Amino acid sequence: MNTLVDLNDKVIRGYLISLVGEEGLRMIEEMPEGEVTDEEIAAKTGVLLNTVRRTLFILYENKFAICRRERDSNSGWLTYLWHLDFSDVEHQLMREKKKLLRNLKTRLEFEENNVFYVCPQGCVRLLFDEATETEFLCPMCGEDLVYYDNSRFVSALKKRVDALSSV
């Protein structure tokens, strides 16, 4: 396999599992060297052909798989030859980290700048404005809404943002 990456690294493993799942990771680990067809990958790895194709497509979308088409001169059929290239994985992980950090900061700002009310039965969590529209009654079950102190959640978000910012 043409990876140029340590698949035992827990961050890289976790990222690949989030992209292609456990079966996809198994396919990556057992994929033959060089250019191979999806059928050859399925035969060598024991992963179902549909899973192999789905995994290859996801890897291709994320620029971790390279595909070359070859036309059979006799039948006219196209054959797709695949190989993997994880040389850009560090850059991809940095982009994912920045996106996650941006989303966490947006959520933190939302949580800090709003007041929430919840149904004691767990039906809904509403913004103050939404709670006033329902006269502080749960729109699902009719229970009185109660103030929700989100300070623990805000604190957890801040810790997560700080941890990601320092890496």
Curated annotation (Swiss-Prot):
<dbReference type="InterPro" id="IPR017919">
    <property type="entry name" value="TFIIE/TFIIEa_HTH"/>
</dbReference>
<protein>
    <recommendedName>
        <fullName>Transcription factor E</fullName>
    </recommendedName>
</protein>
<keyword id="KW-0805">Transcription regulation</keyword>
<dbReference type="GO" id="GO:0006367">
    <property type="term" value="P:transcription initiation at RNA polymerase II promoter"/>
</dbReference>
<keyword id="KW-0238">DNA-binding</keyword>
<dbReference type="InterPro" id="IPR016481">
    <property type="entry name" value="TF_E_archaea"/>
</dbReference>
<dbReference type="InterPro" id="IPR024550">
    <property type="entry name" value="TFIIEa/SarR/Rpc3_HTH_dom"/>
</dbReference>
<dbReference type="InterPro" id="IPR036390">
    <property type="entry name" value="WH_DNA-bd_sf"/>
</dbReference>
<comment type="function">
    <text>Transcription factor that plays a role in the activation of archaeal genes transcribed by RNA polymerase. Facilitates transcription initiation by enhancing TATA-box recognition by TATA-box-binding protein (Tbp), and transcription factor B (Tfb) and RNA polymerase recruitment. Not absolutely required for transcription in vitro, but particularly important in cases where Tbp or Tfb function is not optimal. It dynamically alters the nucleic acid-binding properties of RNA polymerases by stabilizing the initiation complex and destabilizing elongation complexes.</text>
</comment>
<dbReference type="InterPro" id="IPR002853">
    <property type="entry name" value="TFIIE_asu"/>
</dbReference>
<dbReference type="GO" id="GO:0006355">
    <property type="term" value="P:regulation of DNA-templated transcription"/>
</dbReference>
<dbReference type="InterPro" id="IPR036388">
    <property type="entry name" value="WH-like_DNA-bd_sf"/>
</dbReference>
<comment type="subunit">
    <text>Monomer. Interaction with RNA polymerase subunits RpoF and RpoE is necessary for Tfe stimulatory transcription activity. Able to interact with Tbp and RNA polymerase in the absence of DNA promoter. Interacts both with the preinitiation and elongation complexes.</text>
</comment>
<keyword id="KW-0804">Transcription</keyword>
<dbReference type="GO" id="GO:0003677">
    <property type="term" value="F:DNA binding"/>
</dbReference>
<dbReference type="InterPro" id="IPR039997">
    <property type="entry name" value="TFE"/>
</dbReference>
<dbReference type="Pfam" id="PF02002">
    <property type="entry name" value="TFIIE_alpha"/>
</dbReference>
<feature type="domain" description="HTH TFE/IIEalpha-type">
    <location>
        <begin position="8"/>
        <end position="90"/>
    </location>
</feature>
<comment type="similarity">
    <text>Belongs to the TFE family.</text>
</comment>
